[in-house]
Amino acid sequence: MARHLLLPLVMLVISPIPGAFQDSALSPTQEEPEDLDCGRPEPSARIVGGSNAQPGTWPWQVSLHHGGGHICGGSLIAPSWVLSAAHCFMTNGTLEPAAEWSVLLGVHSQDGPLDGAHTRAVAAIVVPANYSQVELGADLALLRLASPASLGPAVWPVCLPRASHRFVHGTACWATGWGDVQEADPLPLPWVLQEVELRLLGEATCQCLYSQPGPFNLTLQILPGMLCAGYPEGRRDTCQGDSGGPLVCEEGGRWFQAGITSFGFGCGRRNRPGVFTAVATYEAWIREQVMGSEPGPAFPTQPQKTQSDPQEPREENCTIALPECGKAPRPGAWPWEAQVMVPGSRPCHGALVSESWVLAPASCFLDPNSSDSPPRDLDAWRVLLPSRPRAERVARLVQHENASWDNASDLALLQLRTPVNLSAASRPVCLPHPEHYFLPGSRCRLARWGRGEPALGPGALLEAELLGGWWCHCLYGRQGAAVPLPGDPPHALCPAYQEKEEVGSCWNDSRWSLLCQEEGTWFLAGIRDFPSGCLRPRAFFPLQTHGPWISHVTRGAYLEDQLAWDWGPDGEETETQTCPPHTEHGACGLRLEAAPVGVLWPWLAEVHVAGDRVCTGILLAPGWVLAATHCVLRPGSTTVPYIEVYLGRAGASSLPQGHQVSRLVISIRLPQHLGLRPPLALLELSSRVEPSPSALPICLHPAGIPPGASCWVLGWKEPQDRVPVAAAVSILTQRICDCLYQGILPPGTLCVLYAEGQENRCEMTSAPPLLCQMTEGSWILVGMAVQGSRELFAAIGPEEAWISQTVGEANFLPPSGSPHWPTGGSNLCPPELAKASGSPHAVYFLLLLTLLIQS
């Protein structure tokens, strides 16, 4: 049940509670006034998991209206008094006037009152002085009517229990109201009063249940004056809009109000029974407030019980309910797998989500040549379920209102004519609530979905771990859009596969959903993968945004609470972040700032040349790596050596998310440079690389260094272990560079100055790259090391045309600002620099001249 404290809350008069937890103000021998009977409805012929009440069954039930609509329930306890919940009458700690409220009595349907129904204005509202919020108790209120109610068969007061009254644990009681029939699912027209049977739970049992991890990762301390009712397995409960209504129990032919609907965590969730205000606890306070009213509420003596009420044991253990969904004997043997058979079409794969409903893609049933509704002649349709001796017939097809061939709402629900008896062989998959947060690293697996071919290879190809939200959103989300925080619906869910994909395979004809496991329970997490060409699915539309629709249609789908909660500031970002810009070819240059040292430089490649040397490479596009020519080709060589490229390696270890990728090099492309051997080489890979946190292209910038960028040389500390290290550098202006090297440098050569203590961080034989991070977060490749120098790099910008023409998918960002280095002649070189080429002292002297030269 949605937390009732989220309702519009109003209250007016505050009054103390003398002796709130004391026994009755009357002795057990005192009798109530004879002129007021209570708790005896006239004989007659939602609430989560409930049903329509018969007219006149609950004549004390009232509807409290504010602003023209039903807000809360209440109970008539005397002709001039109504009992309800305090939280209904308070908004942000402010008490609202009683004159803004009205009470409807004798109402069965909010769409059409019964004979005898009438409305009364509210003269005063009284709440306990110590009420502050529902979790702290004292959640009750008394409403004094402006004029007495007209009593009759449809309007009659309920009995109230004395402080000494003891309701037996396990007693079947009834809650009533016009609240939501499920979370975020209002009671439909004609708004008939709902009733549901709930079992009273002892305080120790309730506390044990609420001490277990559950919805929203919250626990609760059950306080004196609180009462619990419901079932460990959930599915029957009060909900939003039922607040203030009565929980009544029959004893000796009378109905006593045991509780006032107060709050809960969700509606009908497992191991989260509803929490009610225990009316008996507040007998003295109620008597004090209504003193002088004639007739007042009736507190009859408790009828003699037929058996004693044993004291509930105080042990901390309790029998918790386990999920009834999502259990499979092994991955791939899914007991919820369903095949919808439509004459003349290939089977459509879906999933059993309740005893009576199957979820499948709506596109299976749409005519590609028509925008009309799917055919409604369902007599010939059949559904095949695991271990079922016969095919199930289809009674109804319900499409999502936004269903189409290629969007996130490509969903339909099929109702079976005969409900399935659930067993280990046939059970539904669990569905996530909207706030569900699938943890990075969760174990996931692809499952067939819709019409399509099966997997191309062993089942291990279907196994994956879930990427973190930042990576997934920035790879496949909208650039510049804020990354959803944990608990907010994500834009996409992204698997990182554990098994390397077979070279040359194509998954274009297969269709998949994404199942993810928590504590041994499988959830249908994602549906309809994003288009990925021949690659395995890279991203899925999250299902949790559709949970309310599925729940509304089925009224019984197994939406299950999150079962794994070990996340927080150390696991995933909890502050709002945005994604760097994309290019026309997609995301590039992404790196998580909090990445551990030595990992997650997703464009950094190891280029193994003919078994005798390893060069640094940079992934420019899914099928291309850039490296320094002098490292990958021997001087004078014209043949392509055997070269293998590795991505996603931090020394000897694979990255924790996204795993080692290897490709062969099938060709080497060099630009045409007159008279000189070009410093840069493009390596064409044998097949494209799946984009992931361990293999993602870097961005390129066509016009020098954007203002504000910070730059680094990225290489390896030792060539044998190849653990990545980054050395901070400043890129010198072209004028200083020309001064230092007397104009002997090839055009487009960059000079760098290492930060103090950074000179020897990287070994240079592998020709490391020069990178810069732009202010908005993107990383760009600026240059590759020149042979024999630690300070010189071949610039990428001048080769923009060649790279774009050769690669096609190179990620050049739009030019921003002006180049970092100004143009200028070497005739202005200070004499000290002109004589200092190669001298370390000259390099440090540059620090003193930086401001002068830049001016």
Curated annotation (Swiss-Prot):
Tissue spec: Expressed in fetal kidney, skeletal muscle, liver, placenta and heart. Also expressed in tumor cell lines derived from lung and colon adenocarcinomas.
Main function: Serine protease. Hydrolyzes the peptides N-t-Boc-Gln-Ala-Arg-AMC and N-t-Boc-Gln-Gly-Arg-AMC and, to a lesser extent, N-t-Boc-Ala-Phe-Lys-AMC and N-t-Boc-Val-Leu-Lys-AMC. Has a preference for substrates with an Arg instead of a Lys residue in position P1.
Disulfide bonds: 72-88, 173-249, 206-228, 239-267, 348-364, 444-516, 506-534, 615-631, 711-772, 739-751
Subcellular location as annotated: Secreted, Extracellular space, Extracellular matrix
Organism: Homo sapiens
Name by which UniProt lists this protein: Polyserase-2
Gene Ontology molecular function, alphabetical: serine-type endopeptidase activity
Glycosylation site residues: 92, 130, 217, 317, 369, 402, 407, 421, 508
EC annotation from Swiss-Prot or TrEMBL: 3.4.21.-
Biased composition (Polar residues): 301-310
